[in-house]
């Protein structure tokens, strides 16, 4: 019996002999495709080559690619353990050609590897091949180039009569490279029932998919030929091992048998066929390689998928098999078994073990509480459906992923209201939008002390760590790559409030560095959210806090500018206008206000001018603390009347602006430098929003606009003072020319149509029009002529061509009542058989291009007419 590792080597050695470059597997995190959570097939690392964005280093390649199929389009998580075939982690063996060889060689390579005694030596009678029903070329090659029994070839049609929606037509997405494929199945039974072959029954297993990438799929659903054809094949290692080792389940191959045996020893269970053991065995493989490739358990993205996998396995060990912390103990034996995939993983064994151990500890305490809550609610269930909000509380409070809740409920013959679950999740997301990075932490509001804020005067200070939080609880220390929240006894970091975003920067101790991503003030404390980028930080550590100076300065300039904007609006529009909302960050400021009248661009320019005048005045910006009553007496604007304490901070800009404000500001208006309004819009019936930029950002914006004007002036050969007039004239002339062009085009079409009906040839009752232009005609015009001629035919075929300097463009159309006899696509295929041209289409319309001289075109027309004469008898 061949071992799985031997089978893997045989595959790679076979293609090495066929002049393929054996390349390493890419990581499970795609670096060239943001649309993918994980690498889920062998072709992912070559996607840019298939799309034509990148030239291949090698034109023949073979790989053993590690893959994950959880989340997104390919999600096998809920199938694990229930079927003999599915895995979240597997290896995909594949051979690839980038313009080197195509269908013929691919089919011959596959047949040789599978059936030759030198290689896999599988019985030819046991192999079934499925092909796309329109891919006659592949069928002929299978029959001619191999000794397969034609009975063992099955045509697969489109699903729901949707063109190219077939298991045997592979697409990369809604558009892009695509093509038919040949899928190879192995039959486990004794004899094939040729009258009723059911390839999706358990007796059959798909072992290899050969994808022939020869087309480009367009948004309109049409296909065009790719300039270079490619090959992408995929063979699941676990599946081919299942066949070659003559076992009915992937979980019975040597690798899984060893792994399941090791797991059964660790968790002390004798029944190695237990359903939960399959899940645990599969999930430990995924968890190990995800962590090896840089994923850490978390509450979102790839980290959350890893968390789901780990927690599902823990649950099956803890709840089903009654074992406490065990999952991390599987890391060592699993790596020993799987190190053939990448030997470097051995050095990461301890690190992977620790990460899983930490996650297991966190979840272990939640399982018991979660199960008490779930069991309590299961007793109250009506109609055998668990409410979505209950499933969401299990997810949100106890860390139960939805698939885990599903597993438990299925065991109790209960369905989960998944629609209600996702509704509850979306509701919470909407509520917590503003505080998204903090709401994932289970924070206590502490009232026995308060963080002292020194950020008005200092951007650096010495302090001490009071508390540290991870996702669920207060912890004593936080390590490298862990995210969390740190609370200090004193901070220079401004906490988000009054529309101003929180500060970022660094917190440094002698043993570690914590990167502060955001800061928020909750209760009496400032919460610093971020991630440890070096070392470790502990409670009571003495630290130095550093605010990001550049970011803070930009925010301060924008905040002072918001006050100037408020002043200018009051001066120009209405003195009673009050700010309705604002956002002040380092990139820009936005200011919302209510006003019942229309505001034109001239008013916006005036507002901008008032602000820049005050900036040039370079007046002092200063603040002082006073009691609320006195502040209101001296005319300070209070935007949030019910939210102020008795002692308030009053901000003065010169003698013209006075507001209650807790934000950070410039020292003088001149520090702002420049103020530019970039956007002005109405966000509701009576509310306007102004967006603006300041300082260096504003200067860069003005410079770009100036450069754009110069470029346009140069292109239209005008000086900048006359640019608008010149563009208006160009636009007017363009409209006139477009009208003339349209009239001329219509005349050409009209005149030609009159002449062309004299050229009708008849075959029985069918009307045939074949004509060409000995000049280059615009493709759109030629298509229009074809459509108009076709509408005037009752029962006919139209073939039109334009040719100039041997460049041929040909279109063909067939009336609706003829497509059952002959299609436009078939007619183009006849042209392609006569001469090497490229094209395609559908039943009613098809087109092609190529290099053909006039003599050859006339000859082609004669031959096509003869073919049509035979077909239309």
Swiss-Prot record:
Subcellular location: Cytoplasm
Cofactor(s), names only, from the UniProt record: Zn(2+)
Recorded GO MF terms: alanine-tRNA ligase activity; aminoacyl-tRNA deacylase activity; ATP binding; tRNA binding; zinc ion binding
Record-level GO cellular component terms: cytosol
PROSITE patterns: AA_TRNA_LIGASE_II_ALA
Listed Pfam families: tRNA-synt_2c (PF01411), tRNA_SAD (PF07973)
CDD domains: AlaRS_core (cd00673)
InterPro entries the record matches: aa-tRNA-synth_II/BPL/LPL, Ala-tRNA-lgiase_IIc, Ala-tRNA-ligase_IIc_anticod-bd, Ala-tRNA-synth_IIc_core, Ala-tRNA-synth_IIc_N, Ala-tRNA_ligase, Ala_tRNA_ligase_euk/bac, Thr/Ala-tRNA-synth_IIc_edit
Cofactor note: Binds 1 zinc ion per subunit.
Key words of the record: Aminoacyl-tRNA synthetase, ATP-binding, Cytoplasm, Ligase, Metal-binding, Nucleotide-binding, Protein biosynthesis, RNA-binding, tRNA-binding, Zinc
GO biological process terms held by the UniProt record: alanyl-tRNA aminoacylation; negative regulation of DNA-templated transcription
Keyword Metal-binding: yes
Protein biosynthesis recorded as keyword: yes
Domain of life of the native organism: Bacteria
Assigned EC number: 6.1.1.7
Catalytic function, reaction form: tRNA(Ala) + L-alanine + ATP = L-alanyl-tRNA(Ala) + AMP + diphosphate
UniProt subunit comment: Homotetramer.
Family: Belongs to the class-II aminoacyl-tRNA synthetase family.
NCBIfam families in UniProt: alaS (TIGR00344)
Written domain comment of the UniProt record: Consists of three domains; the N-terminal catalytic domain, the editing domain and the C-terminal C-Ala domain. The editing domain removes incorrectly charged amino acids, while the C-Ala domain, along with tRNA(Ala), serves as a bridge to cooperatively bring together the editing and aminoacylation centers thus stimulating deacylation of misacylated tRNAs.
Protein name: Alanine--tRNA ligase
Organism: Wigglesworthia glossinidia brevipalpis
